[in-house]
Amino acid sequence: MKLIERRQYLDKLINVLGTPDIKVITGVRRSGKSKLLEAFRAYIESEDPDCNIIQINFNLPDYDDLLTYRALYDYVNAYYVAGKENFVFIDEVQMCKDFEKAVNGLHASEKYDIYITGSNAFLLSSDLATLFTGRTFEIKVYPFSFSEYMEYFGLKDRYDALDKYVLEGGMSGSYLYKNQEAKYDYIADVFDTLIVRDIRKKYKIRNTQLMDRIVDFLMDNVSNLSSARNITNTLGSMQEKIHHTTVGNYMQYLCNAFAFYKVRRYDIKGKKYLSSNDKYYLSDHTFRYAKLGTKNMDY
């Protein structure tokens, strides 16, 4: 797959290179977290060819023996090289049981510069301070922006490129497929995996039908004012027996996993946030087209 230099993210990593922080790279599935680590590794090796980089990718079966924190901790220490700069890269760290114990232990030894990636539902911004004893530095990675899309395809005409970007979106893994139907199949699979693995697994969702209805509602009402109560009222009219607190929790879970972003209303005159009716946006707009179709495209 073709790679582009995602400089805005790479620069953030370079700026904290060598600091004692635990660097945490989060973002929606398939947004490029692993590729960013690859690019950062190449940068480090170009600057310090003699460094020692210990890299673990839990997406690969090669590391299935390291799925407990003790095994992970011992493995990293076994590959430590005295007298060199030692870096630890761990991809999809949440797949290791009690991973925070291993990371905290490695950090406490003060021997490693640590970088980890993970699914956002398992590495919440609000949880980082409680998971890790050391200071963390979070970098949030997003799907391709419009400018990155243009760079990837070498496009010059912004107007023509915008039409294509609206249809194809920023999930770069879909670019490998030849036709739009296949692209949307890929994007729908990414979203379904996000819902099933990241959200249902993390939060032990039992009412999966309700979760699906909330997802459909938010997708169909992107940029409209929404609240847990008005969604509850809408679904209640379909004879669903639900409570607005449950709906609100499910909406928060969707945001935790970067499926949606919540934008709060702001009172400019009063200079304060309003407490109700926020707007919700998808992390990539093509999730909507892949799941609901393109008949009502509104651009």
PLM regions: where:
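Accessory nucleic acid-recognition modules appended to NTPase machines
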Residues: 180-299
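Pre-Walker A adenine-sensing motif
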Residues: 3-20
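Walker A/P-loop
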Residues: 34
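Conserved catalytic/switch belt of AAA+ P-loop NTPases
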Residues: 100-116, 120-121, 129-130
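Short glycine-rich substrate-engagement loop in P-loop NTPases that contacts/grips substrate
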Residues: 54-86
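Interdomain motor-coupling "hinge/lid" segment immediately C-terminal to the ATP-binding subdomain
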Residues: 119-121, 126-225, 229, 259
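Hydrophobic anchor at the beta1->P-loop junction of P-loop NTPases
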Residues: 25-27
